[in-house]
Amino acid sequence: MLRFVVIGITDNPQPFFPPEVLEIIRQGKVFSGGKRHHEIVAPLLPDDTQWIDITVPLDDVFGQYKQLCGKTAEQTTIIVFASGDPLFFGFANTIQRKMPEADIKVYPTFNSLQMLAHRMALPYHDMQIVSLTGRDWQKLDEALIRGESLIGILTDRQKNPHTIHQRMSDYGYTNYQMTIGEHLGNPEQERISSYDEKAVYSHPNCIMLQKTASQVHPLGLPDAAFSLLDGREKMITKMPIRLLTLQALDLPKRHVFWDIGFCTGSVSIEARRLFPHLQIEAFEIRPECEAIIHENARRFGAPGIHVHMGDFRSVCCDSVATNEKPDAVFIGGHGGHLKEIMARVVSVLAPDGVIVMNSVKAPLVTTDSHQLWNEACRELGLTQEPPMRIQLNDNHPITILKCRR
């Protein structure tokens, strides 16, 4: 059985350890950590010890750990050096995930965001923590949309102060003061500074965002504020209908929302603003709509909508749903291919997932989408819920249709 002792360190080239930890190091035979960690602790390691570099792919690293376990019947102890608090987005979490049977003892130090808050004399009990280290933008987007007052960000070399600042500017989040901490804990290299677009920021670094002003968006984004397809006012789901549609989708308890036939993107954008926890996949066949949804998303501060262009019937639904299956789907347009589209949706729809469509009753509309919907639900074994009929001003009546798996 493997035993791990995980010791947190800062970027200080002359680390301080309590006597208990120093004794553990003196008795150690197998050590592990990143190359930077090795440089810092090398003077403290006993002679004739083994060091295992923590590099990607991590499966190779854990393969070496497991080989050590098989060489002796006795318990093997591996002493791992990790940054800051090893249980704070750290390597101790990875050990628990990869080797849940292993025995782990942790000796933490302050993590980088704690140190940055300390340097700024900034209370951080309400800090929203976002890790972008090897991760996508979802959690940062969510924190910005929610208007969190204090956001601490763990960066990597790709998602760095400049790319983060650019993304925030693109979507209108200029209401935050950005402070960057570099090489925290290293007396010679540590630097705390406000964001400067001309600066070169060294790695490792972390970021603190402090909100300087609130942004208020109404419940129901005004239709007139959206860029439209060829200026056609009827090519947008009107705000009251949009809100009723989102209500029918049960989005507060959903995880993955697909918007098929997004056109201006109004439904996706409204959903993103109201329910930023959602993963949103938006589909559209008309190429001119791609620029429109991106323009509207930037205008309304709705980052993180994944856009897919092309005929939905040609989309590989399985590849889009690789990580999570959709549990809420809105069909905003079907081009007369409703049954085929619904069949493709049902092939990847999560258990208890819902599909919603708005059926328009107009004199010049020859295709009865309500009838096609009823037939598709029956053929696909979907359970329909009572429809909701509504008419807005002098527009054509709309029936909000809903079914579930």
Regions found by a protein language model. Give the residues of each.
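Glycine-centered, small-residue-biased loops immediately flanking beta-strands
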Residues: 255, 278, 353
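Class I S-adenosyl-L-methionine
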Residues: 1-105, 114, 277-280, 284-286, ...
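Conserved class I S-adenosyl-L-methionine
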Residues: 254-263
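S-adenosyl-L-methionine
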Residues: 285-323, 330
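Conserved SAM-binding loop of SAM-dependent methyltransferases across substrates and taxa
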Residues: 264-276
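C-terminal substrate-binding/active-site "lid" region of AdoMet-derived donor-dependent transferases
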Residues: 342-404
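Class I SAM-dependent methyltransferase SAM-binding "motif I" and its flanking Rossmann-like core
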Residues: 12-13, 83-147, 313, 373-391, ...
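A contiguous loop/helix-start segment that scaffolds small-molecule binding in enzyme catalytic cores
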Residues: 2-6, 18-20, 78, 149-234
